[in-house]
A protein has these predicted regions:
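Aromatic- and Gly/Pro-rich donor/ligand-binding loops
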Residues: 1-155, 164
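Membrane-proximal helix-turn-helix segments that form the acceptor-binding/catalytic region
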Residues: 157-171
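A short, active-site helix/loop in glycosyltransferases that binds the activated sugar's phosphate group
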Residues: 172-177
Length: 177
């Protein structure tokens, strides 16, 4: 519980400017040079049928692009739900919590960071793709927004976060806007 308070204190939109200082102290995860590591973040852990379909589409896209030489890590708000989804969809992936510094360690250690599915809208959880992309760009990683919706955006804090996410993105593939 003490760690949860520490993570909650630092993993939020308002801490974007300080996050690189924290990320510097977090160990990189060793990589397998023969595999591309794809770190997928989004609103996983709250999966709808649409979220599951988009996740399967993202996984199939990168398996095809890299001839199955890929390793998937999925960042989840509720990992136990996402583990069940991976089982149901026969997706071989590690699942990590986006409520811990695993978010940062995977963002700096993966080859490609994908914000996949779900909307970019007024949600406090926008810190997930925002912080992941900010760290990824600092470590020269590729970032992709894949299959997301856009809006509604009513508050400046969230509108600015979405603008930052999109500006950090190397590729943007929206489903609607």
């Amino acid at each position: 519980q003490k760690n949860e308070l520490l993570y909650a204190k630092h993993l939020k939109i308002e801490k974007t400017k300080k996050i690189l200082g924290i990320a510097r102290w977090i160990k990189k995860i060793p990589i397998n040079n023969s595999l591309k590591r794809i770190f997928i973040v989004g609103w996983y852990g709250t999966e709808t049928v649409g979220d599951k379909a988009i996740l399967a589409g993202i996984v199939n896209h990168y398996k095809s692009e890299y001839d199955n030489k890929v390793e998937f890590v999925i960042g989840s708000l509720y990992p136990f739900v996402t583990k069940r989804t991976c089982y149901e969809l026969s997706i071989n992936a590690s699942v990590v919590s986006t409520k811990t510094f695993e978010l940062l360690s995977n963002a700096k250690s993966s080859d490609i960071i994908v914000m996949g599915g779900g909307p970019l809208m007024d949600l406090n959880e926008l810190y997930v793709p925002l912080l992941a992309f900010k760290v990824a760009k600092a470590y020269r990683k590729k970032t992709v927004v894949f299959g997301c919706g856009l809006g509604p955006l009513k508050y400046d804090k969230f509108e600015n976060a979405v603008k930052d996410i999109l500006s950090y993105s190397d590729e943007i593939k929206l489903r609607d806007y």
